[in-house]
Structures are given as structure tokens and as C-alpha cells.
């Protein structure tokens, strides 16, 4: 989950961006008398182009902050784009390096005169439906960034009808290769610090990692279609394409991975890829690329709207998160939870040099329900392809012919990140999670071959590992010592181990019987189930291990693993109240960027808490207008777990029962609609408005038996086959079970108000054209046209004690309200950053004031540039005073201890100590 140096994790738990006051999203028009279900297709009628356009991310001013760059990718290669010296992007690829740790390089596109000179209108739009990033300057300049599907190639198409353009150039460059650190556990760091360039009549580029013993490495190269060009090597880390100005042309670029190249020759592969896409041409490639994304979106649908716009924002983040993960999720290796394919930090990564299962499951597990099992399959392949290596290492480490899976694993199954870490070196339950995800892949695809050849062997060997580790004491199988995930070390009967066995053993027995394999092993497995040590309960809630509670080492809510992803309890289970109690008293509410409290709330049917949890996570961690985070502990986890929470709020099938709208808000304005995939291949659709569920539509893909929880309690319902309107069954019960035919559509409806009572409709939306905000938080998506408005010189007088704030010790010490007169140490440049945000620069040392360590340390003037920690929302109070809210953590600045202590951003509300007079100088 995270590095051994966990102290920094807690320091960054609260990270929020600047306050922006924007009108909340308006709910999508809805009607309680219509329905969008298509009885022929078995899905909702959706105008996807129109509907998804309302979730486009729009920048109405040029963004020069690399960390706020918009993201575009084709599944294997991604680019993060911002405006700097023209248009700049950092290009990354999934398969370029171990754990995607090293990026490809920077691409800079410039013209003379500049593309962004002399314009009156500007808009940059990320179209989620098309997967295209379009930048328009007036009506005579458009830059379209897109990709070639199922390849590593992306393109920049330029339409520029201005006269007088004298030059156009594209630079591919690499940052200082000597700055590269071994963040990927590579065996040869020198080859990653070695750059080789080339330039010929057809393309130019450079390569790194060409001698990597693990066969990673890449070539970053570009060519041009539709215009003449020359190429040159500028220096040892930079190449350039000089393009003859014309009104329309396309720049193609690729990050060709060595490991996927014939003969490991990424230079030849890059040139072949560029020649191929150039031969296909821009128009055809763009059409193919759009169709690839259109087909992706057509596989599922969610609407989660209303509640004063809060739910709409959750829905926007849902689609944006889905896009960002999918845009890098189709490589040979999984999208890494930190590195991914979208970053603007060169080769700098955060803290992990491996795949951490907890974090990766956050990213991937939602894609079963959203009908993108192929994405989860890529995650599963990382573990299944290393099956033999992991078994061999299990024999070496534990002396048993079975399967232990390290929580922190390298691309090749190595456990170097696990065995030397106290957090994970005695963590045993990861193998069960990996095996269970493979089993679920079977349950959602009906792929019996995959079950027999891949999933079942994994299940069997992971269970046999537990047989080897458990000890029979006083007639009960017990785990004498292991980690209860990362939070409790070397404890007795970790709840994760007990849950793992209770999950895996019955399933393995069932599959063994189904396949007719390993009959002689089943009795031993059943003995585990029958005699396993019970979970421990204290004060009505599950304990993470046998008492007494061990020292807390991390901020996971381990006991709730029973709820998700171990699927051991939930709505309708005998221990439901115990599970709810466990959620209510969990020790670390939303404690980190990978927290899954809201997914647990959804599984427990806590609808209001689920919405509040999604909102809380975004308030804390969605800090940038592109949807990304400034959290130092992760990147993609909070996006992926948001998807899980929202899917589980709308539909659940984990316990082989289809349950619709189990955890939606109680607010009557909430509107929910979806088409999602349930276990056993049922495509489920339903709509809920004004508190009423209209119907449940089911398309059976494989002809399995369906079991549906009656969403109307025990009102009489019927199951109707839509092809001939035959009534399959009628019941007045809280569940209905019925046989289905493959590729056949059914409707579960009230006999008193069947689906035919509703008029048909198609869901659509209106294109977004501006910035969106999450009500009463600093989280925004997109940028308004307004910008900063200069600076002024001010002093601050604290209401707490009537004294002036000074940058003490000439700025070397924290800010404190301690002096009675204004001098050089008390003067600050107040810089208007736009959207109600400011920065303060101390005149005494010309340094910016920082809410240091994400706001956990006092304010101090010691930064040379403005970032998130140096940004404050300026709040003007009704009495004429002002307050400052730190972007770093969303807390108000206080003159602590009535001004006797340093200023610090740690208050959640404004009182006298949080007020200051702004004194112009």
C-alpha cells in the first residue's frame, strides 16, 4: 500500500484546492412518468454523445501549470498537456519501464507567431466520449490531440489558417538523465541514464533503457503527415522536427516499448508504427479512435444526479475517472496506481517501486460492474503470468509447495518490496484476493476454460498455503502470527486471514466439484471451514485480530475488509448490525487517498453516508481542475475507489442476488439510472426518481439462473420476457428467482404498475462549457476564463491580539502575530491568483508563504514558487475582516493561542482567532 516511511502519509491526509464559488450543476431533466429501457437491446436508450458532453472538462483560459494539464490517451500511451512555450506535454506509456516508473519524455509544439498570440477567444475541451483533447484559439486555430487505437501512437492535428506563420517546430526532449533514480527496482540504472538519438528523412527520436536486462526500455519518436519537414538532432537529449507551415497537418508520435517490439528493437518498432499510422492517414485514424471510445462507453451507463448538484459532481468524476484509467489500462502490464500514463513530474514518482495489491484493487475492481472485464483481466494477468515464479518463491521462503502472493510485487512476481518491509512481510491474504478476482472474472464472463486453467489453480494453491500456515489449537484452526494487513503487525488470528479462508475455501470446494478435480483435497478444505477460529467482537463491532488490540501502524480500517472486497457480509446477513457497528466505529475515517469507507458504506446500504463519503474524498483529494490530486501517497486510487462506491450504490450482485439502488441518498431530488453488469453475465438496467424504482431490466447473456431482490418490498411483481411478453413468474415476496435463456431480455415489474405504464424516452445532455465546483469545497473541474489581477502590498493585523503578523527572523522563522508596528518583516505582496485565491510573498526575503507539510506545520515564508501549499482562498467576512483558507488542507489560518503561537492552518470554522485586518501599504 505504501512505503515504510509512513509518517509522511498521515501528514498529507487533508489536501484540498482553492475555493471557487461557482453555481452547482443543474440536475438533468427527469420525469417520473417516462422510462429509457429498451426492451430489444436490454439496456437504456442513451444518446451517449450528448449525455457525456455534459461531463467534458473545459478550460476557458490557457493553463500553464503542468500539474493541472489535461489528459488524453489511447489505452497504452498517454499525454498530460499544458500551455508552456506553446503547447507542452509529458508523454508516458504503460509498458516502457518496470511498473511504468519512467516516462517517455516531453513534447513541445511551437509556431511563430505563437499559437496563443493575438486571440480573443480560447477554449480547451477534453471530450470524454470521443477521447479527444481540442484546443481552439478564435476560429482560425485548432489543435486536436487524439490517438491510434490498439497501438502506442498518438497524434496532434493542427488546423491553422493564419497568414504569416514563419515557422513550426516539434521538440522531443529528455530531462537531465543523470537525475533518474532507481524508483523502479531496475537491475541496470545506467541504461536508464543513457539517451541515444536519431534523425532521418522520415522521423526523429531518442531511446532509453536499451540495455535493460528485463527487456524494458523504449523509443520516443515523431513524424509529420500533410506537410514537408526536416529533422535534426539538437543535442544528446533532444531532437527536432522543423515543419513547413501549412494550413493543416498532423504530428504523429509514439512511445514504442522494447518489451512489445519484435526482437526488442524499439527504434525499428517506433518507425514502423509511425509509418503505419501515417499510411492510414489522420481522417481514418481519428474515426477509428473515436469509434474505439464510443464502443467503450456503450458497454454501460450510470446517472447519479440531484442533491443540490453534489450527486452530479460525483457522476462527472465517475466518467472522468473511468476515462483516465481506461486511457492507460490496456497495456501488457496494469496501469500503475501512482505512475499510470498521466504525470508531469518527469521521472519523479512518489514512493512505490512495485504493484501494491490494495492500491491496485482500488483502481481496477469497479470495472466488473461497469462491463469492462477486459480491464480487470489485465490486472489479473499480472498475477496469473507469475504463478510459477510465485510458487517457486513460496517453496524457497516457506518450504511449502503452495502459493504465497506478496502484497508488494514487482512486474515479474518478485517480492523485494515486501520481504524487507514490516508493513507487509507477514501479510498472507493477498493471494486470496488475487485468486478471488480471477474467480470473479470467470463469474462475469462465463469463461469455463479460464476457470479451469487459470483461476482454479490459483485458488487451490492459495488455499493450500493457508492449510500450511494455520495451526490446529484446541480444536480450532488458528493463525498464530501474521499481519492484519498493514495496520497491525504479527498478531494472532488476523481478521483478514480468517476472512480469506472463509471466502476462498467454500469457493474452491465448489469449483473443484464443478470441474471434477482434486476430490482428495476437499475434505481437508471443508475441515478448515468447519473448524476455523471465529471472528472476535468487542462492543458490538468486529476486531481486527484477537485482543488486545495491537499498536496501530497504518490507517486502514482492517475489520471492514469483511464487507469489501472479501464479500463476507452486507445487507441481509445475520451479522449485518455488527458490520454497521464496525463501520460506525472505524478508527480511520477517510484517512488516506486509498480509503474505501464509502465503498463499505454502499455495501451496507448506507446511502447518505455513501454520498457523503464520496464527497469527503473529493474534498480532500481532488485538488486539481483536471481531476487529479496533490496527495503525496497516491494518484489513481481515489478515482478508482470512487467508481466502486458509486457502482455499489446503484447495483450489487456480490452475493449472487441482484439488488438495485441499495445505497442511494434519501433526498427526494436524487435521480439514479444505470445499465451495469452483474455476476453470471446479467446486464441490469433500472431507473429511480422521486424515491420510486420503476422497473428492473435484465439481459441474460449466458442463460444462467437469475435471482433478484424485490425493490418494492413484498409488493406483487412479475417477470416478463420482452420478446413475446410471456409472464415467466409472479410472486409476492422479497426475492424472485427464475431461469433465463441466453441473449434474452426480461423485465421485473410491479403488476400494479408495469413498465408499459411509462412513456419511452432517450437520455441525453447539454455540453458543458465551463468550470464546475463541488458545493462548499475547493474542488473544481475545469477553469473559468478569469485570471489573476496583479498584486498589492499589505500587512495583516490579527483580531486575536491586535498585533501585526511578521515573517519572524527575516523569514527564517514561522509567521506570528507579535509586533505592534509595521516594518519590512510585516509587509507582504498579496498576489491575486484568480478565482478568489491569493499568494503572499514576504518582502523581507522575497519568499512565498507556505502552509508547510500540507498545513500540519506553521506558516512560513520559504518557497520560491507558488504551488498548492502556497495558495490561500481569501474570505471576506461581514465585519470587514478577512480570513485565509489554505489550499493545502482546506483549513482556516489561525493566530494560535490568541496570537502567542505561530500562524497555522488547522481550523474548520472562522472565529476571532481566524480573522485578520488587511492593511494596504
Residue ranges and their predicted role:
Residues 20-32:
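Sec-dependent signal peptide cleavage junction
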Residues 31-67, 72, 76-82, 86-353, ...:
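Acidic/polar, glycine-enriched structural segments that form the non-catalytic walls/loops
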Residues 101-110, 636-685, 689:
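Catalytic cores of secreted or luminal carbohydrate-active enzymes
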Residues 149-160, 680-707:
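Carbohydrate-binding surface patches
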Residues 166-175, 697-713:
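Surface-exposed beta-strand/loop patches in extracellular or lumenal glycoproteins
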Residues 356-392, 412-413, 423, 427-448, ...:
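Active-site core of glycosidic bond-cleaving carbohydrate-active enzymes
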Residues 461-511:
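Acidic/histidine-rich catalytic neighborhood
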Residues 787-921:
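Lectin-like carbohydrate-binding module/patch detector with strong preference for beta-trefoil
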Amino acid at each position: 500500500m505504501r512505503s515504510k516511511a509512513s509518517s509522511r502519509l498521515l501528514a498529507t491526509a487533508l489536501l484540498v484546492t482553492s475555493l471557487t464559488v461557482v453555481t452547482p450543476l443543474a440536475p438533468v431533466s427527469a420525469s417520473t412518468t417516462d422510462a429509457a429501457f429498451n426492451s430489444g437491446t436490454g439496456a437504456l436508450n442513451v444518446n451517449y454523445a450528448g449525455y457525456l458532453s455534459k461531463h467534458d472538462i473545459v478550460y476557458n483560459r490557457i493553463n500553464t501549470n503542468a500539474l493541472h494539464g489535461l489528459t488524453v490517451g489511447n489505452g497504452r500511451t498517454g499525454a498530460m498537456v499544458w500551455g508552456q512555450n506553446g503547447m507542452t506535454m509529458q508523454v508516458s506509456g504503460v509498458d516502457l519501464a518496470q511498473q511504468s516508473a519512467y516516462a517517455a519524455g516531453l513534447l513541445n509544439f511551437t509556431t511563430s507567431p505563437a499559437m496563443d498570440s493575438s486571440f480573443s477567444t480560447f477554449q480547451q475541451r477534453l471530450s470524454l466520449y470521443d477521447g479527444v483533447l481540442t484546443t481552439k484559439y478564435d476560429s482560425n486555430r485548432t489543435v486536436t490531440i487524439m490517438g491510434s487505437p490498439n497501438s502506442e501512437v498518438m497524434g496532434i492535428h493542427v488546423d491553422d489558417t493564419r497568414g504569416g506563420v514563419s515557422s513550426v517546430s516539434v521538440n522531443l526532449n529528455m530531462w537531465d538523465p543523470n537525475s533518474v533514480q532507481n524508483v523502479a527496482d531496475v537491475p541496470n540504472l545506467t541504461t536508464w541514464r543513457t539517451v541515444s538519438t536519431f534523425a532521418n528523412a522520415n522521423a526523429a527520436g531518442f531511446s532509453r533503457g536499451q540495455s535493460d536486462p528485463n527487456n524494458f526500455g523504449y523509443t520516443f519518436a515523431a513524424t509529420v503527415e500533410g506537410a514537408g519537414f526536416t529533422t535534426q538532432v539538437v543535442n544528446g537529449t533532444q531532437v527536432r522536427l522543423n515543419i513547413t507551415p501549412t494550413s493543416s497537418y498532423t504530428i504523429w508520435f509514439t512511445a514504442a516499448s522494447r518489451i512489445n517490439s519484435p526482437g526488442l528493437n524499439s527504434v525499428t518498432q517506433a518507425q514502423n508504427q509511425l509509418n503505419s499510422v501515417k499510411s492510414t492517414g489522420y481522417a481514418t485514424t481519428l474515426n477509428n479512435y473515436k469509434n474505439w471510445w464510443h464502443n467503450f462507453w456503450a458497454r454501460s451507463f450510470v446517472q447519479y444526479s440531484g442533491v443540490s448538484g453534489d450527486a452530479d459532481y460525483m457522476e462527472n468524476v465517475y466518467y472522468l475517472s473511468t476515462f483516465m484509467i481506461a486511457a492507460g489500462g490496456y497495456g501488457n502490464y496494469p496501469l500503475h496506481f501512482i505512475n499510470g500514463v498521466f504525470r508531469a513530474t518527469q521521472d519523479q514518482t512518489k514512493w512505490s517501486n512495485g504493484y501494491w495489491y490494495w492500491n491496485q484493487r482500488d483502481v481496477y475492481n469497479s470495472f466488473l460492474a461497469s462491463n469492462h472485464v477486459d480491464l480487470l483481466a489485465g490486472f489479473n494477468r499480472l498475477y496469473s503470468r507469475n504463478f510459477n515464479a510465485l510458487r517457486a518463491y513460496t517453496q524457497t521462503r516457506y518450504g511449502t509447495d503452495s502459493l504465497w502472493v506478496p502484497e508488494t510485487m514487482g512486474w515479474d512476481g518478485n517480492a523485494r518490496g515486501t520481504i524487507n518491509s514490516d508493513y507487509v512481510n507477514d501479510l498472507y491474504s493477498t493471494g486470496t484476493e488475487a485468486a478471488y478476482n480471477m474467480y470473479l472474472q470467470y463469474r462475469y464472463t462465463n469463461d469455463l476454460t479460464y476457470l479451469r486453467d487459470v483461476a482454479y489453480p490459483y485458488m487451490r494453491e492459495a488455499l493450500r498455503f493457508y492449510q500450511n500456515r494455520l495451526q490446529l489449537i484446541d480444536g480450532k484452526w488458528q493463525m498464530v502470527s501474521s499481519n492484519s494487513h498493514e495496520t497491525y503487525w504479527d498478531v494472532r488470528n488476523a481478521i483478514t486471514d480468517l476472512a480469506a479462508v472463509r471466502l476462498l475455501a467454500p469457493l474452491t470446494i465448489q469449483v473443484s466439484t464443478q470441474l471434477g478435480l482434486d476430490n482428495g483435497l476437499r475434505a481437508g478444505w471443508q475441515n478448515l471451514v468447519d473448524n476455523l477460529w471465529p471472528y472476535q467482537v468487542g462492543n458490538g463491532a468486529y476486531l481486527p485480530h484477537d485482543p488486545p488490540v495491537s499498536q496501530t501502524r497504518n490507517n486502514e480500517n482492517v475489520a471492514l475488509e469483511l464487507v469489501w472486497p472479501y464479500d463476507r457480509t452486507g445487507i441481509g446477513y445475520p451479522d449485518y448490525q455488527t458490520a454497521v457497528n464496525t463501520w460506525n466505529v472505524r478508527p480511520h475515517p477517510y484517512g488516506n487517498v486509498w480509503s474505501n469507507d464509502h465503498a463499505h458504506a454502499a455495501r451496507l446500504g448506507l446511502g447518505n453516508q455513501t454520498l457523503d463519503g464520496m464527497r469527503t474524498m473529493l474534498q480532500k483529494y481532488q485538488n486539481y481542475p483536471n481531476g487529479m490530486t496533490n496527495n503525496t501517497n497516491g494518484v489513481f486510487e481515489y478515482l478508482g475507489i470512487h467508481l466502486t462506491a458509486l457502482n455499489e450504490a446503484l447495483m450489487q450482485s456480490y452475493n449472487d442476488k441482484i439488488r438495485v439502488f441499495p445505497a442511494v441518498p434519501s433526498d427526494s431530488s436524487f435521480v439514479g439510472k444505470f445499465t451495469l453488469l452483474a455476476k453470471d453475465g446479467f446486464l441490469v438496467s433500472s431507473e429511480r426518481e422521486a424515491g420510486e424504482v420503476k422497473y428492473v431490466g435484465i439481459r441474460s447473456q449466458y442463460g444462467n439462473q437469475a435471482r433478484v431482490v424485490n425493490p418494492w418490498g413484498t409488493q406483487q411483481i412479475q417477470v416478463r420476457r420482452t420478446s413475446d411478453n410471456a409472464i415467466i413468474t409472479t410472486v409476492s415476496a422479497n426475492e424472485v428467482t427464475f431461469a433465463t435463456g441466453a441473449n434474452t431480455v426480461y423485465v421485473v415489474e410491479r403488476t400494479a404498475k408495469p413498465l408499459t405504464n411509462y412513456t419511452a424516452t432517450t437520455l441525453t445532455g447539454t455540453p458543458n462549457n465551463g468550470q464546475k465546483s463541488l458545493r462548499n469545497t475547493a474542488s473544481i473541474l475545469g477553469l473559468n476564463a478569469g485570471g489573476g489581477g496583479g498584486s498589492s502590498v499589505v500587512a495583516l493585523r490579527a483580531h486575536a491580539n491586535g498585533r501585526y503578523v511578521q515573517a519572524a527572523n527575516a523569514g527564517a522563522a514561522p509567521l506570528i502575530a507579535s509586533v505592534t508596528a509595521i516594518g519590512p518583516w510585516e509587509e507582504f505582496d498579496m498576489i491575486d491568483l484568480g478565482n478568489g485565491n491569493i499568494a503572499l510573498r514576504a518582502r523581507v526575503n522575497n519568499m512565498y508563504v507556505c502552509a508547510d507539510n500540507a498545513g500540519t506545520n506553521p506558516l512560513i515564508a520559504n518557497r520560491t514558487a507558488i504551488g498548492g501549499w502556497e495558495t490561500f482562498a481569501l474570505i471576506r467576512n461581514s465585519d470587514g475582516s478577512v480570513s485565509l483558507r489554505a489550499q493545502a488542507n482546506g483549513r482556516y489560518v489561525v493566530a494560535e493561542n490568541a496570537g502567542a503561537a505561530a500562524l497555522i492552518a488547522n481550523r474548520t470554522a472562522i472565529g476571532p482567532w481566524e480573522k485578520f485586518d488587511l492593511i494596504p501599504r
